[in-house]
Amino acid sequence: MGAIETIEKYIRKIYHRNKVPPRVKAKAVLLYHWGIALRKVEKFIKALGLRGSREAIRQWYHRLSELIELVLESSQQLYVDETKIRGRRRLYYLWLAVDKEGKPCFAYLSRRRDTWTTKIVLSSSRGRKITTDKGWWYKRACRELGLEWRHETFGGRNAVERAFLLIKHRLKGFYKRFPWNAKFETISSFLRAFIFLYYTLEGLS
């Protein structure tokens, strides 16, 4: 099953009524995911003689965030990292963990980066062995949660860094329209949809 067919299958899980054919929605979602502007994706849909506004396309994409649990794995050994995401007049933090095979185990957007937030992130992961960078918030949180903590500069964390690079590259494509002008919930929804699609498509390759 190819990328379009796979995403079409998931579109059908979310939308039971479709004025726009699910396959067209799947193509539109993939174009947007790969960095094509909403304006151009809208023109693509209209060229097919169908109606699909920019806002509708954006909503199709964000609805896929509901399916992120389908790509998340469970593992005792986690490689965890976080990166800064600039939102409306402030910074947020995207946390991502993968297992030893590079498969995602959790993704979480927070307003803070401290021991308290790290404990929330790690306690929801169910992992027992945590490998991170030297961030003090990890070591302290692992100690308080009774988790085994290890520092590693490269290794398993490379898979997380690759995902972050792609996310940052995609966000740069918005120039200054998003996520700098967006609310926390909107940014979180977009990132969860992106991560779902990224790992779904990676699994097809």
Listing of model-derived features with the role each one plays in the protein:
Residues 1-205:
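Residue-level recognition of single "structural anchor" positions
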